[in-house]
Amino acid sequence: MLKGNLAGLMKQAQQMQENMKKMQEQLALIEVEGQSGAGLVKVTMTCRNEVRRVSIDPSLLADDKDMLEDLVAAAFNDAVRKAEATSQEKMSGMTSGLPLPPGFKLPF
């Protein structure tokens, strides 16, 4: 009986690994957009944290350089938070039956 349980666990782990790989591939295709300055600065990135685009409204180019840098950083951080939230949401279905501690993040 122990042998059967072990084989079942191994099969379940292998299936989860395959599902995890598929989910990571899907996350690489999902894009989120972070914004700052009421949308004057936008950063588009995938849920794998690959930046695709940075958009800066032309009206900001003549303004203070420090302010523009702060807005770019804020938009980037907003995009990272959205990517993390989306990733956690998508992964939660895969880990719902596992006894993982609260706040445990996947993929590793």
UniProtKB/Swiss-Prot annotation:
Keywords, alphabetical: Cytoplasm, DNA-binding
Signal peptide: none
Gene3D superfamilies, sorted: Nucleoid-associated protein YbaB-like domain
Major subcellular site: cytoplasm
GO cellular component, one term: cytosol
Stored Pfam families: YbaB_DNA_bd (PF02575)
Extent of Polar residues compositional bias: 85-95
Stretch list, region Disordered: 85-108
The family this protein is said to belong to: Belongs to the YbaB/EbfC family.
Protein name in the entry: Nucleoid-associated protein Bcen2424_1826
Source organism: Burkholderia cenocepacia (strain HI2424)
Lineage, opening ranks: Bacteria, Pseudomonadati, Pseudomonadota, Betaproteobacteria, Burkholderiales
